[in-house]
């Protein structure tokens, strides 16, 4: 499916179907959007369930991308998280990874070449998280890996079991240049989320596994975790770090 785009005032709208162009224009004025439920609202991100033309969708804004100076500066040279996600996931779905929840629309506003604000709209899916469907969750993740990509936050809350099977959410669908991130996906599921991983799958204990395991242990180091929490707290207080 081809991604179309159009300028609208200060915004650039990217969409898959013409019907979403009008939604994109409405997103430039948040007061016109029918917000059904806000799932998350912080200085870091915004996630909400919205209604448009009698259908439900999920609206997200990666605020961290444009509130942290170094990340905002980097958008001079990048397409941004929202547009990258739209392109990556659309390509992966075209290649058969229909388990990925479909992104439908992106709106981006830039000033001086840097992203000032952006939103992405996904289809809405209902179901339960993957905790009771570990095997199907692992199979969906391994299908991602087979296409040369990785999830990046491989935990049950990002896999939704629906009446149509497993759906994958909250990923940018980035390319895995080496197996490191793919090994890290499964280590995250095993070490952080479930107690009986070996019932469902086996780790491929190669060089990349051991490197990913070392990285996981580094990130779980108490000192590193304290530094991350301190930085998050200060950013939420308005510090530009």
Regions of interest found by a model, annotated:
Residues 1-37, 225-240:
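Juxta-kinase regulatory segment immediately upstream of eukaryotic protein kinase catalytic domains
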Residues 34-37, 43-83:
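ATP-binding glycine-rich loop module of kinase domains
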Residues 49, 56-60, 121, 168, ...:
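Short hydrophobic-acidic sequence motifs that mark active-site Asp/Glu residues
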Residues 78-83, 90-93, 100-135:
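Conserved structural core of kinase catalytic domains
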Residues 143-149:
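Protein kinase catalytic-loop region centered on the HRD/HxD motif
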Residues 149-156:
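Catalytic-loop of the protein kinase fold
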Residues 150, 165-241:
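C-lobe/activation-segment region of protein kinase-like
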